[in-house]
């Protein structure tokens, strides 16, 4: 029996290979970064107190690429049409380019506008290779006419906004240990489920590999982190999530595939939009670092570092479950009920713990240490 004849088996192998490879490579990357001084030094606005290597994205990219290459060499891509096979490699190339832009920023501190220009250029390049929004299917308005084909100019604009927007939303989310990797991993698992329910096998393979490298990296990045993914890692995660969401339908963007990433990533997207609007209202650059982000607000409200991250995790998994309902996936209502129960329980327990800690603080304010993570760290 050929296990790789099953799409689920291929996705499972892809996930495991990416997770194991990333987990094994992270310590090597960390040692390399410490040896050459490629670290993020602590200062008065940052929460870490020792130099932290910011090159964890290297291990993630290598884990992702290794998993896809291994599955391909074992014949796993034989389940795909040649056009879908090409889309996987185009997505991998785009992910690598976005990673290199972020890596250059990690090493040389690029200014925002050159980074943005590079992102737009790469997005245009992958659009030319077929990773594009070519049509929009809105069944409520186009039931008889079918999908609305987009002119090339509009298709290019929509694709660039989609890819660059989601990439930077994930990048700006990378403000606490484990936050970006965890949210991206949850989103990737949601994409695996929906992709297979819609028979979008290529997208499922990509999402499974992405979920694997997120899981492997979290082993070293969850609080207290031993390494940061850096802008290279967050750009890689954001671009890959955005690209996977349009690789499934390839030439067109259906209502379901549009709502899925918007639902799963609505929290970081809304946070990014609110932060940009707030900065612009004050006459500041949209790239000006501050403490407006949701995770900074939760920290200031008194939640600990870990509790803040877990709250955002459970809300993201609830949004992913809601996306499964929209996609009409199997057992969708069971997953939504379970996700809702987890969300409600986490919120209730977190509020009670916070109230208890505040009561202790009011009773004996000198006996309760201040959580240094409550200071936050603006990274975007």
Predicted regions and their residues:
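Extracellular/periplasmic helix-loop-helix junctions in multi-pass membrane proteins
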Residues: 320-338
């Amino acid at each position: 029996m050929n296990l790789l004849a099953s799409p689920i088996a291929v996705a499972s192998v892809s996930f495991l290979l990416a997770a194991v490879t990333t987990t094994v490579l992270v310590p090597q990357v960390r040692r390399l970064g410490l040896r050459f001084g490629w670290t993020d030094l602590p200062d008065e606005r940052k929460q870490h107190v020792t130099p932290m290597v910011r090159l964890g994205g290297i291990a993630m990219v290598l884990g992702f690429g290794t998993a896809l290459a291994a599955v391909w060499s074992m014949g796993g891509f034989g389940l795909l049409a040649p056009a879908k096979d090409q889309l996987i490699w185009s997505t991998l190339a785009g992910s690598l380019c976005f990673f290199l832009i972020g890596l250059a920023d990690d090493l040389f501190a690029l200014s925002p506008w050159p980074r943005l220009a590079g992102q737009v250029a790469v997005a245009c390049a992958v659009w030319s290779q077929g990773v594009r929004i070519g049509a929009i299917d809105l069944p409520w308005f186009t039931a008889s006419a079918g999908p609305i084909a987009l002119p090339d100019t509009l298709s290019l604009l929509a694709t660039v906004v989609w890819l660059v927007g989601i990439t930077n939303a994930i990048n700006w989310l990378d403000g606490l240990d484990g936050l970006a990797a965890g949210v991206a991993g949850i989103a990737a698992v949601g994409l695996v489920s929906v992709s297979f329910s819609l028979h979008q096998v290529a997208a499922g393979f990509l999402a499974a590999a992405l979920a694997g490298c997120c899981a492997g990296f979290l082993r070293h990045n969850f609080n207290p982190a031993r390494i940061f993914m850096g802008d290279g890692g967050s750009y890689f995660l954001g671009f890959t999530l955005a690209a996977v969401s349009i690789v499934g339908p390839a030439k067109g963007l259906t209502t379901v595939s549009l709502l899925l990433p918007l639902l799963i990533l609505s929290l970081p997207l809304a946070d990014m939009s609110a932060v940009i609007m707030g900065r612009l209202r004050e006459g500041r650059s949209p790239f000006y670092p501050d403490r407006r982000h949701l995770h900074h607000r939760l920290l200031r409200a008194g939640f600990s570092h870990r509790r803040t991250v877990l709250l955002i995790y459970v809300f993201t998994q609830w949004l992913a479950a809601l996306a499964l309902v929209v996609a009409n996936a199997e057992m969708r209502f069971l997953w939504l009920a379970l996700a809702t129960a987890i969300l409600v329980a986490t919120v209730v327990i977190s509020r009670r713990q916070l109230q208890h800690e505040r009561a202790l603080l009011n009773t004996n304010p000198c006996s309760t240490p201040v959580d240094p993570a409550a200071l936050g760290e603006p990274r975007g």
